[in-house]
Every structure is written in structure tokens, then in C-alpha cells.
Amino acid sequence: MLQHILLYLINPLAYIVPILLATAFLTLVERKILGYMQFRKGPNIVGPYGLLQPIADGVKLFIKEPVRPSTSSPFLFLATPTLALTLALLMWMPLPLPHAIINLNLGLLFILAVSSLTVYTILGSGWASNSKYALMGALRAVAQTISYEVSLGLILLSMIIFTGGFTLHTFNLTQETVWLLVPGWPLAMMWYISTLAETNRAPFDLTEGESELVSGFNVEYAGGSFALFFLAEYTNILMMNTLSVILFMGSSYDPTMPQISTFYLMMKATLLTLIFLWIRASYPRFRYDQLMHLVWKNFLPLTLALILWHAALPIATASLPPLT
């Protein structure tokens, strides 16, 4: 009995706490990188080299008074930030790092389904705020997320044809000889751009276009509830990059030293996250019609063509993948 309690209590905590810590320090890394790319220092007052800045920010946000517009929907307004962070953390469960918390047979499908649910948190927060700016930001976010999920789903389908299974562990086994980045580089490029759009990052951050919508769907949020949204966004960024590494740059697994494969995996994920920040510092925001044009008129035909190609090639050459 005690063993079960420890298993179901310590296991989730052992993966939630490091994720939240990584998320907190990712905000610091982002501010530092943006600072140096704009020829300034970034946060450097709190602690040595500003290392305690995320802790100071967290404490400040959570001790602030929870302000709520009087016209907003009380339950939905407070439930959506909590749900956003819960879903963001839930998506980490089937990821093999190198061992998953829950080893699902349809791990990819689970991640895709949960990431689709995050749309409801954005829509709920925008609608519950009872503000036209928040609602416009939420509607934009929903259209953007749903559109890019189409391309993400189709790219995943191509990758599944490569490996012959939905289980994320099979991706590691498939890539023992060569990374799937090599045969599937067009897919990898489209996948990376789609993850940028899916996580509402620059240059696709139309949901929080400061120049037009004040701050987007979270404009009415302050204090703790805003911090939860912030944590959810950055947790999603880390999760998407870790998933990108598992799909395209599979980690080398050593059964005697699983820590080394975890270290390599996180190094690659950190590298991809730094490219996210580099892109944010380098590119201006897309126009809304360009955003939709990119996914529906460029990515969709290309991904469909690649699915046909990847499905037809093994059959034509009689080399079916291992359908485990």
C-alpha cells in the first residue's frame, strides 16, 4: 500500500518539479538572449548575474491580489489557467526520457489529443474575461492552433509510416542507425515551423499582438492566474521541442547509463529551444492572412504529397516497415 502511495505521489512530483524549474529558468534565458541581441544586459540585479530573477518574479506574481473584472465569469475565469498548466504537464507523461511515466501504445495520439484540448483553455479565458480584446485574441488563437494541428497531424502520419508504430519508444529504436532528420528533413522543417505556430511563439504570436490587441487572450489576467498561463506556455515550448528531438533526432539509449541518454536528449531540446528564442529576436510578426496562407496553401499540399510518397515508396520497393 505504502509502495503504491509513494509510486503515485513521488513519480508525478519527480517529473513536475524539474519541468517547472526548467520553465522558470527558460524565462530568464529568454530575457538574457533578447537582451544580448539588443545590445543590453537583461536581468542582472536579483542574485549573481540575475539568476534569482525567475524566483523573484514567481513570488511577486503569486503574492499579488487576484484581480478579476466584475463582469467576468467567475468559475471559468479561474479554471482556465489551472486547466492550461494541467494539460501542459499532462503531455509530458508519454515522453520517453528515456523511460515514460506512462508507456502508452498510442503515445503520439495522446499528445495530439491533449494539445487539441489546450484550445479550450485559450477560448475559455478569452470568453470569460468579457473583454473584446481578449475575445479577439482567443478567436485568433483558436483558428491558428486548429489550422497548424492539421499540418502537425499529417507530418506525424508520415513519421509513423517511417517507424511503423505510434509508440514513442519505437522512434528511439528506429533511429539507432540514422536520425529521421536525414530522410525526413522537409518534414522536420515544416514540423518545427508548425510547433512555433502551435505554441503561439514569434513570429506567429498574433494572439498577443501588443500593437493591436493589448496582450491578447490573457489581457485581464494578473497575479497568480497570469503566472499559470505563463508557465503553461513555456512548458508547452519545452514539451514540443523535446517531442521534436524524440521524433527527428532520436536519443541514443544506453541501458547501463540511462542518465546519459536523458542528458543528450535535454541538450538537443535546449538547443532547439534556443533557436525558438533566436527566431523571436530576429523576425517580425506575420500578418494574419500570411499565417493562414502558409499552412493551408503551402504546408498542407506538401505534407499530403509527402504522405503519399512515404506510403507508396516502401510498397513499390516491397520493403514494408516493421508494423509492430
Curated annotation (Swiss-Prot):
Family statement: Belongs to the complex I subunit 1 family.
Segments passing through the bilayer: 5-25, 75-95, 106-126, 146-166, 177-197, 228-248, 259-279, 299-319
Function: Core subunit of the mitochondrial membrane respiratory chain NADH dehydrogenase (Complex I) that is believed to belong to the minimal assembly required for catalysis. Complex I functions in the transfer of electrons from NADH to the respiratory chain. The immediate electron acceptor for the enzyme is believed to be ubiquinone.
Localization of this protein: Mitochondrion inner membrane
PANTHER family: NADH DEHYDROGENASE SUBUNIT 1, NADH-UBIQUINONE OXIDOREDUCTASE CHAIN 1
PROSITE patterns documented for this protein: COMPLEX1_ND1_1, COMPLEX1_ND1_2
EC number(s) reported in the record: 7.1.1.2
Topology versus the membrane: Multi-pass membrane protein
Record GO terms (molecular function): NADH dehydrogenase (ubiquinone) activity
GO biological process: aerobic respiration
DNA damage is among the record's keywords: no
One GO cellular component term: mitochondrial inner membrane
Catalytic activity: a ubiquinone + NADH + 5 H(+)(in) = a ubiquinol + NAD(+) + 4 H(+)(out)
Gene (UniProt): MT-ND1
Keyword terms of this UniProt record: Electron transport, Membrane, Mitochondrion, Mitochondrion inner membrane, NAD, Respiratory chain, Translocase, Transmembrane, Transmembrane helix, Transport, Ubiquinone
Keyword Nucleotide-binding: no
Organism in which the protein naturally occurs: Squalus acanthias
UniProt-recorded name of the protein: NADH-ubiquinone oxidoreductase chain 1
Broad class of enzyme this protein falls into: translocase
